[in-house]
Amino acid sequence: MKGATVTQTVNVVQTAADGLIVAPTVFNGVSGEGARIEVKVTTNGTVNVAINDSWMTNVSSRAAMTEQAMAFNVAVNYGTPRTGSITFTLGDLTETVTVHQLAANIPDIGMESNAVELAAKMYAGWNIGNTLEATGGETAWGNPKITEEYIKKIKQLGFNAIRIPCAWDQYIENPATHEIKESWLDRVNEVVGYCVANDMYTIVNIHWDGGWLENNCTPDKQEENNEKQHALWTQIANRLNHYDERLLFAGTNEPNVDNATEMAVLKSYLQTFIDAGRATGGKNAVRNLIVQGPNTDIERTNNLFGEMPTDVVPNRLMAEVHYYTPWS
């Protein structure tokens, strides 16, 4: 600015409409045992934070600051190494932080026990019902989500085996191939990890699941259901293959069978389950598997079941019945 005899310079600093910087943008080798990570966020506005994976949570305060360290908890990972992301948004600006987490170390006790030996090790079992098999989602029937603290409490009460009934049909994202949503496979794996990491024998099944199998042990549905049974068990077995002998697979739940014709169809479903699991190799090549009697009723099983299905591995099959007979 100029006056008659005075000259003065004024510095003008223009602030960007939106500014957003995050650092670091990548976390490598995050402990599988769980960890807390911090992201430095520099901004001139209110940032929206979206965590794109359920195993991370934002534990930061919401103080209005131009620069702050935002903290996130990364849950324990009992599966395989995984990658997630956190997205920061301010106006039209987006920054993404990628998190690579290792797998936690669960001591591996091997796969040496056959069916008789393994059954003898399970002395008290707990069925976690109305959760992972619930129609509409894990909490749809009124129970909270399964946590590791819950599993630890069951163990403290003296139980050493857990049955996890599971729904799968409602989580299929491609009906043509029966492809299961990766997020659901991850969730089941997470719960199995809670159990095995706490030294609990664990049974995973295909439960009622809308009745597509257990209400249709009939010749007209046999081919269609065997295709679906094979596709589902291939995916389940592959996803959980890394667990040792403390994990068992159960092919069905309570298949409704009234006669020899329907029993033959059920046998084919059970054979498909066994063959699909064994074909995935790895630990599943020798994993102990559980097959279900008709209606899981002991009298009907004694009358209709006959010989056990064929298995390429000797002495690795168990038969399942439920305590419904006698009744009044």
For each predicted feature, which ranges?
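Surface-exposed binding patches on compact interaction domains or structured appendages
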Residues: G19-L20, T43-A71
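Active-site region of glycoside hydrolase catalytic domains
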Residues: E227-S328
